[in-house]
Amino acid sequence: MSHLDEDRDSPLWRHWLKLLSDGRQLTRFDGRGFGLSERDSPALSFEGLVADLEAVADAAGIARFPILGFCHGGPLAIAYAARHPDRVSALVLCGTYAQGRAVRNPTPQDAAERQLLLNLIELGWGQDSPAYRQVFATRAIPDATAEALASYCAIQRASATPGQAQRLTQLFWHIDVSDLLDKLRCPVLVLHARRDDLVPFSQGQLLAQRIHGARFVPLDSANHDLQADEPAWPVLADAVQTFLGEHGGQPAPRDGRDLAALTPREREVLEHIARGLDNEEIAAALFMSEKTVRNHVSAIFAKLDFTNRGRLIVWARDAGLGRQHRD
């Protein structure tokens, strides 16, 4: 769970934010029911959360970008990347899973423990005393400083109401996106702490095994949320920086042309143009008539001020499009 205002100055996340924003634009958002977003949303579902991610990506106006899926954000990132391969240049999955806890461990004993955790959320999440919330904090960051543990407890309380925290927790426990793993087409980096108590290391292994070509980096840590002062942090930071440097996409050319001027459908057509497809091939790939493709191509030429298809392809590739079939 997150809270954009609280996260900014937290010892839990300062080093993460610096890593991810160094030399690149970082776009974050509080998910439905979290942080600064509307609380107690009546429509809470996995499909709704994926739709929220789609809305944020469209509103940002960025044609192609890498995504970091951390913890519960991982399944959402996987679903988005599987549905929008033309938009995602790379995927970083850290401390996350394909199968929620209730899916991967459907035993009576685990069901009893899950109910106990839900009871703890109901009783202690909103209390002034952090005693109940420390149960979750010490599982997430057992080797963290007292300051980081206190910050974790404070962010928990600020991020969601007890009722919403219960509903979100139950939703995440029952997620299963394992059927989407073989549909991912972008480069994928998987990182996971070996002694993670919240999301077992085996889930990171499963992701790396099931996603074709995934790069797997095991981390020698017990912390679900890696801390800046532990030896595993520079390992993670170096892996992420290297991976994004290779696959994070190029900045849009600074010539006055802007991909944001295109509609989502026009961006899809331009993605296929950048891959070198002709109009007939694009029509087959996108299930539309050649006449419709020609209309989209004409609109793209007009909006981006091109008259030559070859120059358009060069420009689009410089903007990060067309990489899927060329890397």
Model-identified regions with their sequence ranges:
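Conserved HGGG/HGGXW glycine-rich cap/lid loop of the alpha/beta-hydrolase fold
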Residues: 1-38
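Conserved acidic catalytic loop of the alpha/beta-hydrolase fold
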Residues: 47-65
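Conserved alpha/beta-hydrolase catalytic His-Asp/Glu region
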Residues: 126-171, 180
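Short beta-strand/loop motif that positions the catalytic acidic residue
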Residues: 184, 190-192, 196
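Catalytic active-site module of serine/aspartate enzymes centered on a nucleophile-bearing elbow/loop
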Residues: 214-256
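Helix-turn-helix DNA-binding segment
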Residues: 252-298, 302-303, 314, 318-327
